[in-house]
Each structure stands twice: as C-alpha cells, then as structure tokens.
Regions:
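Conserved AdoMet/S-adenosylmethionine-binding subsite of the radical SAM
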Residues: 141-150, 155-234
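Canonical Radical SAM [4Fe-4S] cluster-binding loop centered on the CxxxCxxC motif
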Residues: 95-132
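Conserved alpha-helical substructure of the radical SAM core
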Residues: 121-150
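Short linear Ser/Thr-Pro motifs
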Residues: 72, 105-106, 119, 189, ...
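Short, small-residue-rich loop/turn micro-motifs
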Residues: 83, 108-110, 213-215
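Flexible, acidic/Gly-rich N-terminal and inter-domain linker regions that tether
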Residues: 1-100
C-alpha cells in the first residue's frame, strides 16, 4: 500500500479526488499527521468512518521504530531508525541556542564515494521516499517532545541525487499545514551535482544550499571527491 506521508498537500488533494473524495480532506489529514502527530487513521475523528476505512484499505502511515539512540555530553543525539523494509538510516539531533536542528538522511547508502565521508562505507541500496525523509523529523519530535526548528539534508546519501523526493519532502516540511518549518531553516548540502543545483535554484523555495568543496583546486578535490571529475571547480 502507499505511504500517505509520501504526498505533498497538492498531490494528496489530487489523490483523494481520484478515489471519489473531496480535495479539502487533504488539509484535514495533513493537520492530523503533521500537527496532531497521530499514528493511525482511526484517530482522525473529524473524518467519516467510511473515509477512514477507505484510507486504511489503500494507504499506510509510515511510523519508524528507533533501533538505537546515542547521546553525547553536549546533548547531541544520534538515531538509528528501522525504515520497515529491513534497512536502517541515521539522523542526528543537535541543540543550539536558537533551537533544535536535525540532520536527515536522503538515501540508504550513497553513490558519491567521497573519501572523507562515513557514508562512503555504506553501499547504495535505494533512495528514500519523501515520507521516509519527513518521518525522521516526526520520529525525533515524538521521542524528545520538542519542536525541531531547523532541518539539514546532510545525513546519509546525496540529496540532489534523490531530487524529486527531497523536493517533495521540503514542500511538506515547509507547508504551514504540514510540519511548518520556514524555508530559510531548511538547508540542502550537496557534493556538487551542478544540473540539480540549477534545478533547485529555479524552484520557488527559499531554502539554503551548501556545496561541499573540501579543496581549493581540482586536482586535490578530484582525489577526494569523484564527482569533481564530472563537475569541477572551474
């Protein structure tokens, strides 16, 4: 079945209309999932029993299990999540004076092969769906009871190699009826997939972008980052 968290608001409206329901129900479902943080359709009490049954028959609500949690002396927490298909991903919660920031994964493993990155040791398996990305934020908020103020796409995987799902996740995170995190509090970190950088710049989203250089010249950067052979500094 489809994970209902994989839909942004407009897609969910379209999906509901396609199954004979009113589009405005999407806003109600969004509120239940992202603001009330319910874990089942049965808890969505302003939806009819008939609609709740239809949702249960056609969709799931993906909820992660925490496999392991580590906490450092400064309050930083690392989470290992079971993503319900036999794979696992990591997220890191960091506390700052301005709020709580989470570093999320966008893929299971990574293709980029950067020598300095721990993700290089994890073989690429697949990209995460939008809902699987967003669920990292929801699961950590549930565990801590605190609101996350900043999201950084700097965990396992290259975000721009999973462009469509990362973009959809950003739209869910930024939507006032969704997770409601300001776009300027969402940052995407990339090893430098230039065509996708241009694509992101053309989106109507004011998120921030960080490019990992790690060297001031192409020779040194290529020795550490294979992506530089395709998209170099020059």
């Amino acid at each position: 079945m489809k994970n209902i968290k994989d839909y942004d608001l407009q897609d969910l409206k379209d999906e509901l209309v396609s199954i004979g329901e009113k589009g405005f129900r999407a806003e109600q479902i969004f509120k239940w999932i992202y603001q009330e943080k319910v874990k089942s359709f049965d808890e969505m009490t302003n939806l009819s029993l008939e609609l709740r049954e239809k949702l249960k028959q056609n969709y799931t609500i993906c909820n992660y299990n925490i496999l392991k949690k580590l906490e450092s002396s400064d309050g930083t927490r690392k989470y290992l999540f079971d993503i319900l298909d036999g794979n696992a991903i990591e997220s890191v919660l960091m506390e700052y004076h301005y709020g709580k920031s989470i570093c999320v994964s966008s893929q299971v493993g990574c293709k980029m092969g950067c020598k300095f990155c721990a993700s290089t040791g994890i073989p690429f398996i697949r990209s995460l769906s939008a809902g699987e990305i967003v669920e990292q934020i929801l699961a950590v908020e549930q565990d801590t009871g605190d609101k996350i103020s900043n999201v950084v796409f700097m965990g396992i995987g290259e975000p721009l190699d999973n462009y469509d799902n990362v973009l959809k996740a950003i739209r869910i995170l930024n939507n006032p009826q969704g997770v409601n995190i300001g776009a300027r509090h969402i940052s995407v970190s990339t090893s430098g997939l230039v065509p996708r950088i241009y694509d992101l710049a053309n989106e109507n989203i004011q998120c921030t972008l960080s490019v990992s250089l790690h060297a001031s010249n192409d020779e040194k950067r290529s020795s550490m980052m294979p992506v530089n052979n395709s998209y170099n500094i020059e």
